[in-house]
Swiss-Prot record:
Summary of the function given for this chain in its UniProt record: During embryonic development, some isoforms are essential for proper neuronal differentiation and organization. Required for cell polarity; maintenance of apicobasal polarity. Plays a critical role at septate junctions in cellular growth control during larval development. The presence of a guanylate kinase domain suggests involvement in cellular adhesion as well as signal transduction to control cellular proliferation.
Residue ranges occupied by any Guanylate kinase-like domain in the UniProt entry: 780-955
Domain spans labelled PDZ: 216-303, 330-421, 506-587
Membrane topology: Peripheral membrane protein
Protein name per the record: Disks large 1 tumor suppressor protein
SMART domains for the chain: GuKc, L27, PDZ, SH3
Gene behind this protein: dlg1
Source organism: Drosophila melanogaster (Fruit fly)
InterPro entries found in the cross-reference section: DLG1-like (IPR016313), GK/Ca_channel_bsu (IPR008145), Guanylate_kin-like_dom (IPR008144), Guanylate_kinase_CS (IPR020590), L27_1 (IPR015143), L27_dom (IPR004172), L27_dom_sf (IPR036892), P-loop_NTPase (IPR027417)
Length: 970
C-alpha cells in the first residue's frame, strides 16, 4: 500500500496502537524496542518543531532584517538541510553566517560571505525587491501552513488531558518559544541567551543527545500530591556548583511513583513550559505549586546513568542499566523443607529504606536454601523472580504482593537480585552502632537514671496532634518518646558529605495540616538540638532542604544554640504557619550523639542482671494481642520507624513490648505469621492519645436526645425505673432493649453484678489491645450479631444455611399453653424461685421479665446447639459475650458499624432522620461499651456487602483453633 504524504502524521498513532496490543509475556522484548522507537520519534519530531519555530522567529519575524537578508538566510538554511539530510541548529547557523538580528550591518557589508547572492539581487534593485518580497511572502505562507500542521500534530501527541482546552497556534508558539530556550542543550540555544545567562557547572560538558536524554512527563496531581522531592537552585546548589533542580526522592503512593518514568537525579528543565533553569529553589517550588492538577515536566538525565526503577518496569530493564548501576545477578534456588530460607522487608507503604519502595533481604535462615547457596546477602534488593517460565516483577509493589509471590513458588525459582553496597549499608543502619528493625526496643529515659546521665532526652515529633506525655495541654502537637527510640531503627546514620554545605543555611518550611514533619533530639548539657528523623512526604521532606544531622540554630529568630529540649519544642510549637529555620549540617556531632544513645542502650542491657527495676524494663517481653482499633501508620507522624497497619480484630504477635511507648509486632495470618515486622503504639501510648483527643468531646449516651436525662447516668435511670433491678442488680430497662435495635416486644434483660459496676466506669474506657492465647475447640462457636441490621442478618444466615446455623430453646416461668411442647418451644421452669436462683448462679447468659414472667437464654441451651455442629444464633446484648466466655463458649461477636446517619437511612428507607440519628448514636455507644469483646467490626455501603463480610468473618473464625482472651496483663 503506497504511503501518502497527508497520512504521515498518523505514523505515531499507528505505532502506539500496535504497541498497546502487545500484552502477552512473550511480547515484552518487542514492546521495549517499540518504546525506544516512539521515544526517538517524539524527540526528533519535537526537535524539528523547535528548529522550524526558531527559524520562523529569528529570521522571518525579525523586522530589523531586509527582505534580501531573509531570502538569503532561508535559501542557505534550506540548502543546508537538503545537504545534511537533517535539521540544522538555527541559532548556531545564523551565528556562524553572521545572519542574526544584531548583525544586519555586517550582513550588508560582508561581500565574502554572500557575494553571489548579493550581486544577483542588486542587478535590478526595483524588480528584485518586488520579486524577493513576493518570494518571501510565498515562503511565509507556505511555512505558516506547515507550521500549523506540525503544531497541531504536536498538540495531539502530547495533549495534557482529554478535558484540556486545545491551545491555539499562537499560544503554542509562545509556549514553545519559552520551552525551547530551557529544554535544549546550551549549544542549541541562542548565543545571546548563553552569554546572558549565568554559567553553571555541568552545562559546559553537555554534548547534545550524546550526553543527555530528554523526556516529557505528564503527571496528574492526586490526593498525595505529585509525589517527589526536589533540591537545588541558584541559592542552594545540590551538587557542587550545579544549580539545576534535581529530583531527590520519589514518594510512595504519589503520582510520580505511579507513573514510573521520573527517576532520582533527573533534572527538571521546565514545568508546564515555565523554565526552571538557573532559578532560585523557591522559584522552582513555586512553579510546581502553581502548575495546577495536570503538570507537564520536561526533564533531562545523563546517558548511562542508573536510575530508580520505574513502577511496572520488568527485571530486564534493571539488567539493562546494570553496567552503570547496581550489580544485577541471577540466583537459582530450590525450595526445601525450610522454604527459600530468607526474610524480606519493604514495599509500597512499608519502606525498608526511606524513599525506596524496593523489596530487600533482611534475614537468612540457618540451613535454608539461600544460605546453602551462599550468594544471597542481607541488604540485597529483590528485583524479580522467575518460575515455571514466567517472570514476576517485584519493583514498586506492596509487601503483601511480594510475600504472596514468594509463597506461591513450588520448587525451583530464579531470583533476580540487585547487589549494591549502599543498600547493604543503609539496611544495617550505616554502621555497627545502628539499630535494625529486628533489635530490641529499649527502656524509657526515666528508667535509665544512671550516674552517667541524669538528664532526660526526648524524641520530639512536630507533626502529631496529640498531648505530650509530660503535659496535659490539649492543644499540644508534640509527642515525646524515650531516648533510645529516638534513633529510628533501620534509618541510616547521618553520613558526612561534601554535597551539603557546612555553613549555616536559612530554610523556610510551610507548616502542613500535620505539622512540620520532622523529629528533634538533644537539648541537654548544651549539646544542641538536632534533626533525627524526617517524615517521608511531610513538609520538611518535600522541601528537601532540611537534613538528618542538621543542628537547629534558630527558629523564627529565636536562638536555639544552647536551648533545652523543652525550649526548642516550644519554639517550634508556637512558630506559626511559616517557619524560618537557621540550620547547620553537623553529621559528626550528630553521630557522636547517636553513639552515646547506643552506649546507654548497651549499658542498660549489660546491667539487666542488676537491680530488679532495671531487669523488668530491659527484658524482651513477647505476647499475642487482639487489636481493638484500626491503625494507619501513615497518620501517625510520631513513629520512630516503619509502622505496621492493622484493623480491629487483627491478631498481632508483639515480639517486644518492653518499651513504654512503642511495641514491635507482626500480624498473625491464619496459622502463620507475616514476615514483615513493624512498630505499633503501645497500649499506654494509644490510650493516652485517645483520651487527649476526646478530652473536650464526651459522648453522653442518649442525653443528646433527651435533655431531661443529662444529669442522670445510665445506672441511675435503671435503679429509678425498675425496682426489680434492686433484687437482681443486672437488669436492663425497656428503653435500653430498644436501643439494641430489636424489633421484638421490649422486656428486661439481665446483667451480672460486675457488669453493672463496670458500666458506670466504662465511660472512660479506651479500646486498645486485648491479650489473647491460642485455643483448640471441639464445638461450633455461637454467633452474636450486634448493631443495625442484626435481625435481617440473623434471618438471612438461618435461611441460607439451615444446616450450619440454628437457634436455641429459651427458658420461661410462663405457664405452658395447649399447643406448646416443652423443650421445643420453651423450657418451662416449674417455679420462679428456681429460675431466679439459676440466674444468680450465672447459668443464664441473659434473662429478663415480661408481664411478670421471666424469660432467659441458658448456657446449657447454647451448648446443646454448639455440640450439634451448628452456630447458635443469639439475639442478645453485648454483655452476653462475656458471660459466654466465662462459660468457655467463645462466640463469634460481629459488630455492624454504620458509617454515618445517612448510611443508616439508606439501608432502611422507612426510617426518619431522627430515628436514624438515634440508631447511629446507639451503635456508637454500643461500640464504646462492648468493643473489647467484639471478634471483629464490619462496615459496608450496601446490605449485600455487609452480609458478605459477616459471613467471611464467621467462616474465618470458626476454628478449630481460635484466639481467646488470656489473663496476661498488658
Amino acid at each position: 500500500m503506497p504511503v501518502k504524504k497527508q497520512e504521515a502524521h498518523r505514523a505515531l498513532e499507528l505505532l502506539e496502537d500496535y504497541h498497546a496490543r502487545l500484552s502477552e509475556p512473550q511480547d515484552r522484548a518487542l514492546r521495549i524496542a517499540i518504546e525506544r522507537v516512539i521515544r526517538i520519534f517524539k524527540s526528533r519530531l519535537f526537535q524539528a518543531l523547535l528548529d522550524i519555530q526558531e527559524f520562523y522567529e529569528l529570521t522571518l519575524l525579525d523586522d530589523s532584517k531586509s527582505i534580501q537578508q531573509k531570502t538569503a538566510e532561508t535559501l542557505q538554511i534550506a540548502t543546508k538541510w537538503e545537504k545534511d539530510g537533517q535539521a540544522v541548529k538555527i541559532a548556531d547557523f545564523i551565528k556562524s553566517s553572521n545572519l542574526n538580528r544584531n548583525c544586519a550591518y555586517e550582513f550588508n557589508n560582508d561581500a565574502s560571505s554572500n557575494q553571489t547572492n548579493q550581486s544577483a539581487l542588486n542587478q535590478n534593485p526595483i524588480a528584485n525587491n518586488v520579486s524577493a518580497q513576493a518570494q518571501a511572502e510565498a515562503l511565509s505562507r507556505t511555512f505558516k501552513s506547515e507550521l500549523e500542521e506540525i503544531l497541531n500534530q504536536r498538540m495531539r501527541i502530547e495533549s495534557d488531558t482529554e478535558n484540556a482546552k486545545e491551545p491555539t497556534v499562537e499560544q503554542q508558539q509562545k509556549q514553545q518559544q519559552a520551552q525551547q530556550r530551557s529544554s535544549r542543550s546550551p549549544q542549541q540555544q541562542n548565543p545571546q541567551q548563553q552569554q546572558g545567562s549565568k554559567s553553571r557547572s555541568g552545562s559546559q560538558t553537555v554534548n547534545g543527545d550524546d550526553s543527555w536524554l530528554y523526556e516529557d512527563i505528564q503527571l496528574e496531581r492526586g490526593n498525595s500530591g505529585l509525589g517527589f522531592s526536589i533540591a537545588g537552585g541558584t541559592d542552594n546548589p545540590h551538587i557542587g556548583t550545579d544549580t539545576s533542580i534535581y529530583i531527590t526522592k520519589l514518594i510512595s503512593g504519589g503520582a510520580a511513583a505511579a507513573d514510573g518514568r521520573l527517576s532520582i537525579n533527573d533534572i527538571i528543565v521546565s514545568v508546564n513550559d515555565v523554565s526552571v533553569v538557573d532559578v532560585p529553589h523557591a522559584s522552582a517550588v513555586d512553579a510546581l505549586k502553581k502548575a495546577g492538577n495536570v503538570v507537564k515536566l520536561h526533564v533531562k538525565r545523563k546517558r548511562g546513568t542508573a536510575t530508580t526503577p520505574a513502577a511496572g518496569s520488568a527485571a530486564g530493564d534493571a539488567r539493562d542499566s546494570a553496567a552503570s548501576g547496581p550489580k544485577v545477578i541471577e540466583i537459582d534456588l530450590v525450595k526445601g523443607g525450610k522454604g527459600l530460607g530468607f526474610s524480606i522487608a519493604g514495599g509500597i507503604g512499608n519502606q525498608h529504606i526511606p524513599g525506596d519502595n524496593g523489596i530487600y533481604v533482611t534475614k537468612l535462615m540457618d540451613g535454608g536454601a539461600a544460605q546453602v547457596d551462599g550468594r544471597l546477602s542481607i541488604g540485597d534488593k529483590l528485583i524479580a523472580v522467575r518460575t515455571n517460565g514466567s517472570e514476576k516483577n517485584l519493583e514498586n509493589v506492596t509487601h503483601e504482593l511480594a510475600v504472596a509471590t514468594l509463597k506461591s513458588i513450588t520448587d525451583k525459582v530464579t531470583l533476580i537480585i540487585g547487589k549494591t553496597q549502599h543498600l547493604t549499608t543503609s539496611a544495617s543502619g550505616g554502621g555497627g552502632g545502628g539499630l535494625s528493625s529486628g533489635q530490641q526496643l529499649s527502656q524509657s529515659q526515666s528508667q535509665l537514671a544512671t550516674s552517667q546521665s541524669q538528664s532526660q532526652v526526648h524524641q520530639q515529633q512536630h507533626a502529631t496532634p496529640m498531648v505530650n506525655s509530660q503535659s496535659t495541654e490539649p492543644g499540644s502537637r508534640y509527642a515525646s518518646t524515650n531516648v533510645l527510640a529516638a534513633v529510628p531503627p533501620g534509618t541510616p546514620r547521618a553520613v558526612s558529605t561534601e554535597d551539603i554545605t557546612r555553613e549555616p543555611r536559612t530554610i523556610t518550611i510551610q507548616k502542613g495540616p500535620q505539622g512540620l514533619g520532622f523529629n528533634i533530639v538533644g537539648g541537654e548539657d548544651g549539646q544542641g538540638i538536632y534533626v533525627s528523623f524526617i517524615l517521608a512526604g511531610g513538609p520538611a521532606d518535600l522541601g528537601s532542604e532540611l537534613k538528618r544531622g542538621d543542628q537547629l540554630l534558630s527558629v523564627n529568630n529565636v536562638n536555639l544554640t544552647h536551648a533545652t529540649h523543652e525550649e526548642a519544642a516550644q519554639a517550634l510549637k508556637t512558630s506559626g504557619g511559616v517557619v524560618t529555620l537557621l540550620a547547620q549540617y553537623r553529621p559528626e556531632e550528630y553521630n557522636r550523639f547517636e553513639a552515646r544513645i547506643q552506649e546507654l542502650k548497651q549499658q542498660a542491657a549489660l546491667g539487666a542482671g542488676g537491680s530488679g527495676t532495671l531487669l523488668r524494663t530491659t527484658q524482651k517481653r513477647s505476647l499475642y494481642v487482639r487489636a481493638l482499633f484500626d491503625y494507619d501508620p501513615n497518620r501517625d507522624d510520631g513513629l520512630p520507624s516503619r509502622g505496621l497497619p492493622f484493623k480491629h480484630g487483627d491478631i498481632l504477635h508483639v515480639t517486644n513490648a518492653s518499651d513504654d511507648e512503642w511495641w514491635q509486632a507482626r500480624r498473625v495470618l491464619g496459622d502463620n505469621e507475616d514476615e514483615q515486622i513493624g512498630i505499633v503504639p503501645s497500649k499506654r501510648r494509644w490510650e493516652r492519645k485517645m483520651r487527649a483527643r476526646d478530652r473536650s468531646v464526651k459522648f453522653q449516651g442518649h442525653a443528646a436526645a433527651n435533655n431531661n436525662l443529662d444529669k442522670q447516668s445510665t445506672l441511675d435511670r435503671k435503679k429509678k425505673n425498675f425496682t426489680f433491678s434492686r433484687k437482681f442488680p443486672f437488669m436492663k430497662s425497656r428503653d435500653e432493649k430498644n436501643e439494641d435495635g430489636s424489633d421484638q416486644e421490649p422486656f428486661m434483660l439481665c446483667y451480672t453484678q460486675d457488669d453493672a459496676n463496670a458500666e458506670g466506669a466504662s465511660e472512660e474506657n479506651v479500646l486498645s489491645y486485648e491479650a489473647v492465647q491460642r485455643l483448640s475447640i471441639n464445638y461450633t462457636r455461637p454467633v452474636i450479631i450486634l448493631g443495625p441490621l442484626k435481625d435481617r442478618i440473623n434471618d438471612d444466615l438461618i435461611s441460607e444455611y439451615p444446616d450450619k446455623f440454628g437457634s436455641c430453646v429459651p427458658h420461661t416461668t410462663r405457664p405452658k399453653r395447649e399447643y406448646e411442647v416443652d423443650g421445643r418451644d420453651y423450657h418451662f421452669v416449674s417455679s420462679r424461685e428456681q429460675m431466679e436462683r439459676d440466674i444468680q448462679n450465672h447459668l443464664f447468659i441473659e434473662a429478663g421479665q415480661y408481664n411478670d414472667n421471666l424469660y432467659g437464654t441458658s448456657v446449657a441451651s447454647v451448648r446443646e446447639v454448639a455440640e450439634k455442629g451448628k452456630h447458635c444464633i443469639l439475639d442478645v446484648s453485648g454483655n452476653a459475650i462475656k458471660r459466654l466466655q466465662v462459660a468457655q463458649l467463645y462466640p463469634v461477636a460481629v459488630f455492624i458499624k454504620p458509617k454515618s446517619v445517612d448510611s443508616v437511612m439508606e439501608m432502611n428507607r422507612r426510617m426518619t432522620e431522627e430515628q436514624a440519628k438515634k440508631t447511629y448514636e446507639r451503635a456508637i455507644k454500643m461500640e464504646q461499651e462492648f468493643g473489647e469483646y467484639f471478634t471483629g467490626v464490619v462496615q459496608g455501603d450496601t446490605i449485600e456487602e455487609i452480609y458478605s463480610k459477616v459471613k467471611s468473618m464467621i467462616w474465618s473464625q470458626s476454628g478449630p483453633t481460635i484466639w481467646v482472651p488470656s489473663k496476661e496483663s498488658l
